[in-house]
Amino acid sequence: MTDKILVTGADGFVGSHLTEALVRSGYDVRAFVMYNSFNSWGWLDHCANDIKGKFEVFCGDVRDPHGVRQAMKDCNAVLHLASLIAIPYSYHSPDTYIDTNVKGTLNILQAAREFNVSRIIHTSTSEVYGTARFVPITEDHPLQGLSLIHI
């Protein structure tokens, strides 16, 4: 099996640039994007022309374990960036955030275990540290997320 990397959240700002950088570095990339009826790949729609067509796109939803398993087949590494952002919406729609950010991550981990994926990198946000107690903030800073999406 050739090294294939699954990038979840590839339709987001960071995920799209990561996908582009991985392709430029010679990696075989499967870009997991959120399905939508417009067939839009989010920020990937705007990637450089010389990159388009050099990565595989999988349209799905990390909340669906069946689709996650299908997306992960033949991959040996996962860069998990898929999540919902926008703090104000998390206050009035917390279940949606839990389903995507928590259960979606669980689906990624379970599929990785099933397919013996050897490497998983999960991204987060500096917002998990809350108001800075000291600067610069390091990874040793106490975790004190201020909202549901930052815990």
Predicted stretch roles:
Residues 1-149:
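N-terminal Rossmann-like NAD(P)+-binding domain of SDR-like oxidoreductases, especially those catalyzing
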